Amino acid sequence: MTRPGRVSRARRKRLDKQRVVHAGVAVADRAGIDSLSMRTLADDLGVAPMALYKHVADKEELLDGMLDVVLGEIDLPAPGSDWKSAVRKRILSARQALLRHPWASRVIETRTRPTPVALAYIDAMIGMLRNGGFSPDLTHHALHALGSRLYGFTQDVFDDSGRQDAGAEPSATAREMAATYPHIAEMMTVIYHDAASVVGPGCDDQFEFELALDLLLDGLDKRRRRPTSDRSPAPGGSARPESAKPRA
């Protein structure tokens, strides 16, 4: 018979960051984010709390990793998809991920710096719009209009409080950003330094709110002008089949 001490040591040996992070997701899904602490997570894993700190520095790093798990559940669009269907699929998949993990939206609001996984996701979203013919400036406004928090990041990605002057040499961090996330770097350069931006440097909440409202109203007006039978999408997002349409 295996002694309890040996079982405990074996369990600790198998512990790694992925297991810790996924266990955190499971606890938050099951009992809510308020119930999650390093101690309750350790109890759930059957280890001492200090064992967790070998894999995550603190609860903040744990939460970052948990959000990365949620982002990893978001489907990638099929290769060759047009921008509209690609972005639509991405957003709908993101919505489903957030519905599966209701705590995630709340945690997103507390993040001050996106993780590399989040930055890669943002960069891919921007790339879809740029490849669809959107200018960097319009891409910036499109992200606001579509709802930045649905993508898993806050406006801190575009925080301009400590930005350099337009003529300053780019920092090592900026150069690294440009090499790793070229679409983000391009858009940030435009919205901070390009006079062609409709808003000017940084983000104007009132402008973005009004633009999103106008886009929504324009879209509703366009939908209103369609024939009645074409207005209501089916659950999958496409027009309802003929048999499902209301009869006159």
Language-model features and meaning:
Residues 1-31, 35-40, 44-47, 56-63:
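Basic, helix-initiating cap at the start of DNA-binding domains
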Residues 75-120, 136-146:
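Hydrophobic alpha-helical connector segments
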Residues 201-230:
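A hydrophobic membrane-anchoring alpha-helix module
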Residues 121-173, 190, 220-224:
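Hydrophobic alpha-helical bundle segments that form small-molecule/ligand-binding pockets
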Residues 18-26, 31, 61-77, 86-96, ...:
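Alpha-helical structural segments
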Residues 1-15, 75, 186-196, 228-248:
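N-terminal intrinsically disordered/low-complexity leader segments
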Residues 171-201:
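C-terminal lobe substrate-recognition/regulatory segment of protein kinase catalytic domains
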